[in-house]
Amino acid sequence: FLPILASLAAKFGPKLFCLVTKKC
């Protein structure tokens, strides 16, 4: 797993989770 992808996932993961689950 690429470090860049890992950092992107860490950065955008919570936002995606927020949008999908509507739990912000």
Curated annotation (Swiss-Prot):
- Gene Ontology cellular component list: extracellular region
Q: Which UniProt keywords apply?
A: Amphibian defense peptide, Antibiotic, Antimicrobial, Cytolysis, Disulfide bond, Fungicide, Hemolysis, Secreted
Q: Which InterPro entries match?
A: Antimicrobial_frog_1
Disulphide linkage map: C18-C24
Instruction: Identify the tissues in which this protein is expressed.
Output: Expressed by the skin glands.
Classify the main location.
secreted
Record's superkingdom?
Eukaryota
Q: Which GO terms describe its biological process?
A: defense response to bacterium; defense response to fungus; killing of cells of another organism
Which subcellular locations apply to this protein?
Secreted
Q: Which family does it belong to?
A: Belongs to the frog skin active peptide (FSAP) family. Brevinin subfamily.
Provide the function of this protein: Antibacterial activity against Gram-positive bacterium S.aureus and Gram-negative bacterium E.coli. High antifungal activity against C.albicans and a strong hemolytic activity.
Name the UniProt record assigns to this protein = Brevinin-1BYa
Organism in which the protein naturally occurs = Rana boylii (Foothill yellow-legged frog)
